[in-house]
Amino acid sequence: MFTESMLFLLLFLLLGLIAKNNSLIIAVAVVILLKLFHVDGKVMEMVQAKGINWGVTIITVAILIPIATGQIGFKDLIDSFKSAAGWIGLGAGIAVSILAKKGVSYMAVDPQVTVSLVFGTILAVVLFRGIAAGPVIAAGIAYMAMQLVAFIK
């Protein structure tokens, strides 16, 4: 039961509890349960291979909800391009999408980088209360760019 991988997962669970990060706690708990119940290796491989896409899909659904509920309409889209923040947001979204595509390709060529990415992501989640998400990164880049624009003015 206490294999190296289980100890590693328990360490991440402890870090999640210390940092009070529910996302990390839930993710680690799910993986531990999959491991404890000896879920088939094919299921684990499928989750590993497709999990990122599932996560992006869920985030995309959450982003589209304000459009579906009428909170955001065409007027808001048009108005967004009347400000520097709107254009920077568009550019940040495009840049992050391109970077993500390149990152996925790079991970396929050099899978060893995945270990560092996983560890770095978990460190950022625990130490800096970061969030492991893609579109949120685009918003963060847009925020940083807007801070730069405000500083230059």
Curated annotation (Swiss-Prot):
The keyword Cytoplasm does not apply. It is found in: Cell membrane. InterPro entries: UPF0756_TM (IPR007382). Keywords: Cell membrane, Membrane, Transmembrane, Transmembrane helix. Coiled coil: none annotated. It is a multi-pass membrane protein. GO terms for cellular component: plasma membrane. It comes from the Bacteria. Belongs to the UPF0756 family. PANTHER family: UPF0756 MEMBRANE PROTEIN YEAL. This is UPF0756 membrane protein lwe1581. It comes from Listeria welshimeri serovar 6b (strain ATCC 35897 / DSM 20650 / CCUG 15529 / CIP 8149 / NCTC 11857 / SLCC 5334 / V8). The lineage of its organism: Bacteria, Bacillati, Bacillota, Bacilli, Bacillales.
